[in-house]
Protein backbone atom coordinates (compact mmCIF):
# COMPACT_ATOMS: atom_id res chain seq x y z
CA UNK A 1 0.00 0.00 0.00
CA UNK A 2 1.34 3.43 -0.93
CA UNK A 3 1.20 6.21 1.61
CA UNK A 4 0.63 9.93 1.23
CA UNK A 5 1.33 11.88 4.36
CA UNK A 6 -0.18 15.30 4.91
CA UNK A 7 1.00 17.46 7.76
CA UNK A 8 -1.90 19.59 8.92
CA UNK A 9 -0.24 22.84 9.94
CA UNK A 10 0.97 24.73 6.88
CA UNK A 11 3.28 21.90 6.07
CA UNK A 12 6.74 22.32 4.72
CA UNK A 13 7.43 19.00 3.12
CA UNK A 14 9.59 16.07 2.50
CA UNK A 15 10.64 13.91 -0.30
CA UNK A 16 10.29 11.37 -3.12
CA UNK A 17 12.15 10.33 -6.23
CA UNK A 18 11.71 9.00 -9.68
CA UNK A 19 13.04 8.49 -13.15
CA UNK A 20 15.02 5.27 -13.42
CA UNK A 21 13.63 1.79 -12.94
CA UNK A 22 12.57 0.72 -9.47
CA UNK A 23 12.79 -2.88 -8.34
CA UNK A 24 9.55 -2.74 -6.37
CA UNK A 25 9.73 -6.29 -5.00
CA UNK A 26 8.60 -5.82 -1.42
CA UNK A 27 12.13 -5.66 -0.05
CA UNK A 28 12.64 -2.12 -1.35
CA UNK A 29 10.81 0.86 0.16
CA UNK A 30 10.69 3.75 -2.31
CA UNK A 31 10.30 7.32 -1.11
CA UNK A 32 9.82 10.31 -3.39
CA UNK A 33 11.32 13.70 -2.54
CA UNK A 34 11.39 17.08 -4.23
CA UNK A 35 15.10 17.88 -3.79
CA UNK A 36 18.42 16.43 -2.72
CA UNK A 37 20.69 16.41 0.31
CA UNK A 38 23.13 19.33 0.49
CA UNK A 39 25.22 18.41 3.58
CA UNK A 40 26.13 14.85 4.57
CA UNK A 41 27.88 15.77 7.82
CA UNK A 42 25.49 14.83 10.67
CA UNK A 43 27.04 17.60 12.78
CA UNK A 44 25.95 20.42 10.46
CA UNK A 45 23.18 18.98 8.25
CA UNK A 46 20.19 21.29 8.63
CA UNK A 47 17.77 20.67 5.80
CA UNK A 48 16.33 17.76 3.81
CA UNK A 49 19.05 15.48 5.17
CA UNK A 50 16.68 14.60 8.00
CA UNK A 51 14.98 11.91 5.88
CA UNK A 52 17.99 9.62 5.26
CA UNK A 53 19.74 10.59 8.49
CA UNK A 54 16.82 9.66 10.73
CA UNK A 55 17.31 6.11 9.46
CA UNK A 56 21.14 6.15 9.58
CA UNK A 57 21.69 7.81 12.97
CA UNK A 58 20.08 7.86 16.40
CA UNK A 59 19.99 10.36 19.30
CA UNK A 60 20.42 9.66 22.99
CA UNK A 61 16.67 10.13 23.52
CA UNK A 62 13.60 10.29 21.33
CA UNK A 63 10.66 12.59 21.97
CA UNK A 64 7.33 10.81 21.53
CA UNK A 65 5.05 13.38 19.91
CA UNK A 66 2.12 10.99 19.46
CA UNK A 67 0.40 12.21 22.65
CA UNK A 68 -0.07 15.49 24.46
CA UNK A 69 2.39 14.58 27.21
CA UNK A 70 5.39 14.46 24.82
CA UNK A 71 7.25 11.76 26.72
CA UNK A 72 10.97 11.15 26.36
CA UNK A 73 11.76 7.56 25.40
CA UNK A 74 15.13 5.78 25.39
CA UNK A 75 17.35 5.95 22.35
CA UNK A 76 21.07 5.34 22.71
CA UNK A 77 20.65 6.33 26.37
CA UNK A 78 18.59 4.03 28.58
CA UNK A 79 18.17 6.37 31.56
CA UNK A 80 19.11 9.84 32.78
CA UNK A 81 18.98 12.08 35.84
CA UNK A 82 19.48 15.78 36.46
CA UNK A 83 20.50 17.83 39.48
CA UNK A 84 17.98 20.03 41.30
CA UNK A 85 19.53 23.16 39.82
CA UNK A 86 19.35 21.69 36.29
CA UNK A 87 23.08 22.13 35.66
CA UNK A 88 24.29 18.52 35.82
CA UNK A 89 22.78 15.77 33.69
CA UNK A 90 23.91 12.15 33.83
CA UNK A 91 23.07 9.64 31.11
CA UNK A 92 23.36 5.87 31.24
CA UNK A 93 24.21 4.59 27.77
CA UNK A 94 22.99 1.52 25.96
CA UNK A 95 25.43 -1.40 25.87
CA UNK A 96 26.42 -3.62 22.95
CA UNK A 97 25.77 -0.97 20.31
CA UNK A 98 28.08 -0.63 17.33
CA UNK A 99 28.46 1.99 14.64
CA UNK A 100 28.20 0.87 11.02
CA UNK A 101 32.00 0.96 10.73
CA UNK A 102 32.44 -1.45 13.65
CA UNK A 103 33.38 1.18 16.24
CA UNK A 104 31.85 0.66 19.69
CA UNK A 105 29.32 3.19 20.97
CA UNK A 106 30.28 4.46 24.43
CA UNK A 107 30.71 7.60 26.54
CA UNK A 108 33.82 8.68 24.63
CA UNK A 109 31.79 8.64 21.43
CA UNK A 110 29.16 10.93 22.98
CA UNK A 111 31.85 13.32 24.18
CA UNK A 112 33.50 13.32 20.75
CA UNK A 113 30.23 14.11 18.96
CA UNK A 114 29.16 16.96 21.26
CA UNK A 115 32.64 18.53 21.36
CA UNK A 116 32.92 18.34 17.57
CA UNK A 117 29.42 19.69 16.96
CA UNK A 118 30.04 22.60 19.34
CA UNK A 119 33.12 23.60 17.33
CA UNK A 120 31.02 24.51 14.30
CA UNK A 121 29.18 27.78 13.84
CA UNK A 122 26.59 26.53 11.38
CA UNK A 123 23.70 24.13 11.21
CA UNK A 124 22.23 23.32 14.62
CA UNK A 125 25.50 23.61 16.55
CA UNK A 126 23.82 26.25 18.72
CA UNK A 127 21.77 23.59 20.53
CA UNK A 128 24.89 22.77 22.57
CA UNK A 129 25.64 26.39 23.52
CA UNK A 130 24.79 25.84 27.21
CA UNK A 131 26.98 22.75 27.52
CA UNK A 132 30.14 23.76 29.34
CA UNK A 133 31.70 20.31 29.54
CA UNK A 134 31.02 16.67 28.65
CA UNK A 135 32.66 14.04 30.86
CA UNK A 136 33.01 10.35 30.07
CA UNK A 137 32.65 8.95 33.60
CA UNK A 138 32.75 5.30 32.56
CA UNK A 139 32.32 3.14 29.48
CA UNK A 140 28.56 3.67 29.56
CA UNK A 141 28.16 6.74 31.77
CA UNK A 142 28.40 10.34 30.59
CA UNK A 143 27.86 13.65 32.41
CA UNK A 144 26.88 16.98 30.87
CA UNK A 145 27.76 20.11 32.85
CA UNK A 146 25.78 23.19 31.81
CA UNK A 147 26.57 26.85 32.38
CA UNK A 148 22.86 27.57 32.96
CA UNK A 149 19.72 25.42 33.21
CA UNK A 150 18.44 24.08 29.90
CA UNK A 151 16.07 21.22 28.88
CA UNK A 152 18.90 18.90 27.89
CA UNK A 153 16.59 15.91 27.48
CA UNK A 154 14.82 17.82 24.69
CA UNK A 155 18.10 19.02 23.26
CA UNK A 156 19.62 15.55 22.91
CA UNK A 157 16.47 14.45 21.04
CA UNK A 158 16.82 17.16 18.37
CA UNK A 159 16.39 16.05 14.77
CA UNK A 160 19.33 18.29 13.85
CA UNK A 161 22.75 18.38 15.49
CA UNK A 162 22.13 15.57 18.02
CA UNK A 163 22.75 12.41 15.98
CA UNK A 164 25.43 10.13 17.43
CA UNK A 165 28.12 9.15 14.91
CA UNK A 166 31.41 7.28 14.92
CA UNK A 167 34.54 8.84 16.50
CA UNK A 168 36.40 7.40 13.50
CA UNK A 169 35.06 10.44 11.65
CA UNK A 170 38.12 12.33 12.91
CA UNK A 171 40.27 10.21 10.58
CA UNK A 172 38.04 10.68 7.54
CA UNK A 173 38.76 13.04 4.67
CA UNK A 174 36.39 15.93 4.06
CA UNK A 175 35.55 14.32 0.73
CA UNK A 176 34.41 11.09 2.40
CA UNK A 177 32.29 13.03 4.90
CA UNK A 178 30.75 15.05 2.06
CA UNK A 179 29.75 11.84 0.28
CA UNK A 180 27.75 10.36 3.16
CA UNK A 181 30.22 7.90 4.67
CA UNK A 182 30.00 9.00 8.34
CA UNK A 183 28.86 5.92 10.28
CA UNK A 184 25.86 5.91 12.57
CA UNK A 185 24.09 3.28 14.69
CA UNK A 186 20.72 3.34 12.94
CA UNK A 187 18.77 0.49 11.33
CA UNK A 188 19.96 1.44 7.85
CA UNK A 189 23.40 2.22 6.49
CA UNK A 190 24.48 4.50 3.67
CA UNK A 191 25.08 2.56 0.46
CA UNK A 192 25.17 4.99 -2.45
CA UNK A 193 24.30 8.48 -3.61
CA UNK A 194 23.67 9.70 -7.12
CA UNK A 195 23.47 13.47 -6.75
CA UNK A 196 20.07 14.91 -7.62
CA UNK A 197 18.81 11.44 -8.44
CA UNK A 198 18.84 8.80 -5.70
CA UNK A 199 20.03 7.90 -2.20
CA UNK A 200 20.13 4.23 -1.28
CA UNK A 201 20.26 2.86 2.26
CA UNK A 202 20.66 -0.82 3.14
CA UNK A 203 19.75 -2.80 6.24
CA UNK A 204 22.22 -2.76 9.15
CA UNK A 205 22.53 -6.45 10.09
CA UNK A 206 24.13 -5.58 13.45
CA UNK A 207 21.39 -3.21 14.52
CA UNK A 208 21.01 -3.36 18.29
CA UNK A 209 17.22 -3.69 18.23
CA UNK A 210 17.48 -6.78 16.04
CA UNK A 211 15.42 -7.81 13.04
CA UNK A 212 13.12 -10.46 14.45
CA UNK A 213 10.02 -8.96 12.87
CA UNK A 214 9.11 -10.04 9.38
CA UNK A 215 7.81 -6.65 8.24
CA UNK A 216 10.97 -4.76 7.36
CA UNK A 217 12.70 -3.68 4.17
CA UNK A 218 16.17 -4.62 2.99
CA UNK A 219 16.66 -1.36 1.10
CA UNK A 220 15.35 2.20 1.19
CA UNK A 221 15.54 4.22 -2.02
CA UNK A 222 15.01 7.96 -1.75
CA UNK A 223 14.52 9.35 -5.21
CA UNK A 224 14.59 13.00 -6.25
CA UNK A 225 11.66 14.10 -8.41
CA UNK A 226 11.12 17.84 -8.70
CA UNK A 227 7.72 17.75 -10.40
CA UNK A 228 4.77 17.12 -8.09
CA UNK A 229 2.76 15.69 -11.00
CA UNK A 230 5.43 13.02 -11.50
CA UNK A 231 5.45 12.18 -7.80
CA UNK A 232 1.68 11.78 -7.95
CA UNK A 233 1.94 9.46 -10.95
CA UNK A 234 4.52 7.34 -9.13
CA UNK A 235 2.08 6.78 -6.28
CA UNK A 236 -0.79 6.00 -8.64
CA UNK A 237 1.28 3.51 -10.63
CA UNK A 238 2.87 1.85 -7.60
CA UNK A 239 6.40 3.05 -8.40
CA UNK A 240 6.64 4.82 -5.04
CA UNK A 241 5.56 3.66 -1.59
CA UNK A 242 5.63 6.97 0.25
CA UNK A 243 5.25 10.54 -0.93
CA UNK A 244 5.01 13.94 0.66
CA UNK A 245 4.22 17.33 -0.87
CA UNK A 246 1.44 16.15 -3.14
CA UNK A 247 -0.75 19.21 -3.89
CA UNK A 248 -3.82 19.46 -1.66
CA UNK A 249 -5.99 19.88 -4.72
CA UNK A 250 -5.15 16.32 -5.83
CA UNK A 251 -5.84 14.50 -2.57
CA UNK A 252 -9.43 13.62 -3.46
CA UNK A 253 -8.13 11.91 -6.58
CA UNK A 254 -5.80 9.76 -4.50
CA UNK A 255 -8.45 8.88 -1.92
CA UNK A 256 -10.32 6.93 -4.59
CA UNK A 257 -7.43 4.49 -5.06
CA UNK A 258 -7.72 1.23 -3.11
CA UNK A 259 -3.96 0.84 -2.64
CA UNK A 260 -3.30 4.38 -1.40
CA UNK A 261 -3.81 5.63 2.14
CA UNK A 262 -3.92 9.38 2.77
CA UNK A 263 -3.34 10.27 6.41
CA UNK A 264 -3.29 13.54 8.34
CA UNK A 265 -1.15 14.41 11.35
CA UNK A 266 -0.58 17.64 13.29
CA UNK A 267 2.89 18.91 12.38
CA UNK A 268 5.45 20.99 14.23
CA UNK A 269 5.90 23.08 11.13
CA UNK A 270 4.99 26.66 10.33
CA UNK A 271 4.93 28.15 6.85
CA UNK A 272 6.93 31.37 7.02
CA UNK A 273 9.13 33.63 4.92
CA UNK A 274 12.58 34.90 5.84
CA UNK A 275 13.28 38.63 5.59
CA UNK A 276 16.83 39.92 5.22
CA UNK A 277 17.15 42.55 7.95
CA UNK A 278 20.63 43.56 6.73
CA UNK A 279 19.68 44.74 3.26
CA UNK A 280 17.50 47.53 1.84
CA UNK A 281 14.54 47.80 1.98
CA UNK A 282 13.81 45.08 4.55
CA UNK A 283 16.39 46.57 6.90
CA UNK A 284 13.61 49.09 7.63
CA UNK A 285 11.37 47.78 10.41
CA UNK A 286 8.31 49.56 9.04
CA UNK A 287 8.75 47.87 5.66
CA UNK A 288 8.90 44.54 7.46
CA UNK A 289 5.76 45.41 9.40
CA UNK A 290 4.01 46.38 6.17
CA UNK A 291 4.88 43.02 4.63
CA UNK A 292 3.61 41.23 7.73
CA UNK A 293 0.34 43.19 7.70
CA UNK A 294 -0.17 42.21 4.05
CA UNK A 295 0.12 38.48 4.81
CA UNK A 296 -3.41 37.05 4.78
CA UNK A 297 -3.02 33.86 6.81
CA UNK A 298 -6.75 33.12 6.96
CA UNK A 299 -7.19 33.29 3.20
CA UNK A 300 -4.08 31.20 2.57
CA UNK A 301 -5.25 28.48 4.94
CA UNK A 302 -8.73 28.46 3.46
CA UNK A 303 -8.03 28.64 -0.27
CA UNK A 304 -4.47 27.32 -0.63
CA UNK A 305 -4.41 24.63 2.06
CA UNK A 306 -8.10 23.78 2.00
CA UNK A 307 -8.37 24.37 5.76
CA UNK A 308 -5.85 21.58 6.41
CA UNK A 309 -3.78 24.00 8.45
CA UNK A 310 -4.37 26.32 11.37
CA UNK A 311 -3.57 29.99 11.46
CA UNK A 312 -0.30 30.30 13.38
CA UNK A 313 -0.18 32.41 16.52
CA UNK A 314 3.60 32.80 16.50
CA UNK A 315 6.79 31.74 14.77
CA UNK A 316 6.82 28.44 16.69
CA UNK A 317 3.89 26.04 16.05
CA UNK A 318 1.34 26.28 18.84
CA UNK A 319 1.28 22.52 19.48
CA UNK A 320 4.94 22.34 20.50
CA UNK A 321 5.63 21.73 24.22
CA UNK A 322 5.52 24.78 26.51
CA UNK A 323 4.31 27.07 23.70
CA UNK A 324 3.37 30.61 24.74
CA UNK A 325 1.84 32.88 22.10
CA UNK A 326 3.76 36.15 21.62
CA UNK A 327 1.93 39.46 21.60
CA UNK A 328 3.90 40.81 18.63
CA UNK A 329 2.21 38.97 15.74
CA UNK A 330 0.89 41.52 13.26
CA UNK A 331 -2.62 40.82 11.97
CA UNK A 332 -3.64 41.06 8.33
CA UNK A 333 -4.72 44.63 7.57
CA UNK A 334 -3.92 46.28 4.22
CA UNK A 335 -4.78 49.78 5.48
CA UNK A 336 -2.39 49.36 8.38
CA UNK A 337 0.22 48.06 5.92
CA UNK A 338 -0.08 51.28 3.92
CA UNK A 339 0.43 53.31 7.10
CA UNK A 340 3.59 51.33 7.85
CA UNK A 341 4.87 52.18 4.36
CA UNK A 342 4.39 55.89 5.11
CA UNK A 343 6.16 55.49 8.46
CA UNK A 344 9.13 53.88 6.72
CA UNK A 345 10.02 57.20 5.11
CA UNK A 346 10.47 55.48 1.75
CA UNK A 347 8.55 56.07 -1.44
CA UNK A 348 6.90 53.13 -3.20
CA UNK A 349 9.51 53.37 -5.96
CA UNK A 350 12.22 52.72 -3.37
CA UNK A 351 10.66 49.49 -2.16
CA UNK A 352 11.44 46.59 -4.49
CA UNK A 353 11.12 43.06 -3.14
CA UNK A 354 12.28 39.73 -4.56
CA UNK A 355 10.41 36.66 -3.30
CA UNK A 356 12.08 33.28 -3.69
CA UNK A 357 9.88 30.24 -3.24
CA UNK A 358 10.03 26.48 -3.77
CA UNK A 359 8.73 25.89 -7.27
CA UNK A 360 8.08 22.18 -6.65
CA UNK A 361 5.22 22.98 -4.26
CA UNK A 362 1.86 24.11 -5.59
CA UNK A 363 0.97 25.42 -2.12
CA UNK A 364 4.08 27.60 -1.97
CA UNK A 365 3.39 28.90 -5.47
CA UNK A 366 -0.20 29.86 -4.66
CA UNK A 367 0.81 31.37 -1.31
CA UNK A 368 3.41 33.51 -3.04
CA UNK A 369 0.91 34.67 -5.66
CA UNK A 370 -1.45 35.70 -2.86
CA UNK A 371 1.34 37.72 -1.27
CA UNK A 372 2.27 39.21 -4.65
CA UNK A 373 -1.30 40.45 -5.11
CA UNK A 374 -1.47 41.98 -1.61
CA UNK A 375 1.94 43.64 -1.94
CA UNK A 376 0.76 45.21 -5.20
CA UNK A 377 -2.29 46.61 -3.39
CA UNK A 378 -0.09 48.46 -0.89
CA UNK A 379 2.25 49.74 -3.61
CA UNK A 380 5.23 47.40 -3.18
CA UNK A 381 6.99 46.28 -6.34
CA UNK A 382 7.57 42.53 -6.25
CA UNK A 383 9.54 40.11 -8.42
CA UNK A 384 8.87 36.37 -8.07
CA UNK A 385 11.81 33.97 -8.23
CA UNK A 386 10.77 30.30 -8.20
CA UNK A 387 13.45 27.66 -7.71
CA UNK A 388 14.35 24.34 -6.12
CA UNK A 389 14.52 24.07 -2.34
CA UNK A 390 18.32 23.64 -2.37
CA UNK A 391 18.76 26.88 -4.33
CA UNK A 392 16.39 28.79 -2.05
CA UNK A 393 18.10 27.39 1.03
CA UNK A 394 21.40 28.85 -0.17
CA UNK A 395 19.70 32.19 -0.86
CA UNK A 396 18.26 32.19 2.65
CA UNK A 397 21.79 32.00 4.06
CA UNK A 398 23.08 34.79 1.80
CA UNK A 399 23.04 38.32 3.20
CA UNK A 400 22.60 39.71 -0.30
CA UNK A 401 19.15 38.16 -0.64
CA UNK A 402 16.19 40.39 0.20
CA UNK A 403 13.43 37.86 0.86
Model-derived segments and their meaning:
Residues 22, 92, 126-170, 192-194:
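Surface-exposed binding/hinge segments that line
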Residues 31, 102, 376-403:
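Periplasmic binding protein-like
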Residues 78-123, 137, 143, 234, ...:
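Aromatic- and charge-enriched surface segment that lines or borders ligand/interaction sites
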